[in-house]
């Protein structure tokens, strides 16, 4: 399939042939959900911790004698039913990361790209370069291209002036092609790929 290439000024700059196996798949929400969940789980802190009965600082002595008081039998004051006792089955420090097959991760990225194209939320530009790091100028360019909320993906290296100019614009994310991922694609309304990024994706998924 052929896609239109645009300049940052919004003008047409030719057409680019892209692979159906990358941009022409039927979106599957179940695969996208699995990949996003896998990504977020890897970044979840997991530093939560509550004190169990073995952690709280209380005496280990038996509270009162076993028989003769008429009360229920109790041993340790650290038991969870007592005030100041340990938490039963509380959270512990752990990693929330789980495995996901590489084939599913690769398929998820292809499906995310296809979903953006199917929804007319994919824009391809010739390059993500500007001569001066002027935020006002870049906002004007984005307006001509028709977006205020987008992920922009460049080649292996992002132009320093472009990065500086875009860094102060809300709801705009910039990534090199190595950092492209399903979560960042889906969390923004539009996906903007440079010609170099598309070529890198074609090479990657050969």
Curated annotation (Swiss-Prot):
Keywords from the UniProt entry: Ribonucleoprotein, Ribosomal protein, RNA-binding, rRNA-binding
Superkingdom to which the source organism belongs: Bacteria
Ranges annotated as biased composition (Basic residues): 65-76
Stretch list, region Disordered: 65-94
GO molecular function terms attached to this record: rRNA binding; structural constituent of ribosome
UniProt cross-references to InterPro entries, sorted A to Z: Ribosomal_uL4, Ribosomal_uL4-like, Ribosomal_uL4_dom_sf
Protein family according to the UniProt entry: Belongs to the universal ribosomal protein uL4 family.
PANTHER family: 50S RIBOSOMAL PROTEIN L4, LARGE RIBOSOMAL SUBUNIT PROTEIN UL4M
Complex formation: Part of the 50S ribosomal subunit.
HAMAP family: Ribosomal_uL4_B
Function recorded in the entry: One of the primary rRNA binding proteins, this protein initially binds near the 5'-end of the 23S rRNA. It is important during the early stages of 50S assembly. It makes multiple contacts with different domains of the 23S rRNA in the assembled 50S subunit and ribosome.
Protein's name in the database: Large ribosomal subunit protein uL4
Organism: Bartonella quintana (strain Toulouse) (Rochalimaea quintana)
